[in-house]
């Protein structure tokens, strides 16, 4: 592996993310209880007064709050519309997130497009440059159709909740880059 690739991998592992996982067939209270048990803290409580969205929260051993909020876009009874909202995560937290999702699934949670569920990943801006953000947008845009097909994403949900990268946005970023280089 060359030095540039090694540096890029190291930087990727420091990338912060926030993840939202939509599910139903589990109450927010039960989901928070499952999370608290998985984290080994046993700490979960109704935090709707502070967080809104009929939220229940669980805390991990690091004191981070993992929220389970109501999301009206999810199909099913209101008490079972549940969206996991993670604290800020890094590469080292991916296994924790994966296992928590498994624990929730074993507790009855369901998450697929037919239930109006999806996953949102928010990428932290720290450490990015205009060029790296352009690269990220271009990589995502070039793979969106493959991801949508592989995950069998519902086209109506894609047009409403998870739109693809707008080609005009990419053109504007490319134009800004060209103009910036000429200056």
Where are these regions (language model features)?
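Extended intrinsically disordered terminal tails
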Residues: 5-13, 152, 156-174
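Active-site-proximal loop/turn and secondary-structure-junction residues that shape catalytic pockets
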Residues: 25, 88-90, 123-127, 155
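Flexible helix-coil linker/hinge segments at domain or subdomain boundaries
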Residues: 44, 112, 145-163
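Conserved small/polar residues in nucleotide/adenosyl-binding loops
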Residues: 176-183
């Amino acid at each position: 592996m060359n030095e540039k690739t090694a540096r890029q991998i190291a930087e990727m592992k420091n990338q912060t993310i926030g993840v939202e996982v939509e599910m139903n067939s589990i109450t927010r209270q039960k989901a928070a209880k499952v999370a608290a048990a998985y984290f080994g803290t046993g700490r979960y409580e109704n935090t709707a007064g502070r967080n809104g969205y009929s939220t229940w929260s669980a805390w991990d051993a690091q004191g981070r709050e993992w929220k389970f909020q109501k999301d009206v876009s999810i199909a099913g009874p209101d008490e079972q519309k549940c969206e996991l909202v993670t604290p800020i995560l890094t590469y080292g937290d991916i296994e924790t997130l994966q296992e928590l999702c498994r624990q929730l699934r074993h507790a009855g949670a369901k998450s697929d497009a037919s239930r109006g569920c999806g996953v949102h990943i928010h990428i932290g801006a720290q450490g990015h440059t205009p060029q790296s953000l352009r690269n990220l947008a271009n990589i995502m845009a070039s793979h969106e159709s493959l991801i949508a097909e592989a995950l069998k994403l519902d086209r109506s949900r894609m047009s409403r909740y998870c739109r693809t990268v707008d080609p005009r946005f990419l053109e504007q970023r490319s134009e800004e880059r060209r103009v910036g280089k000429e200056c």
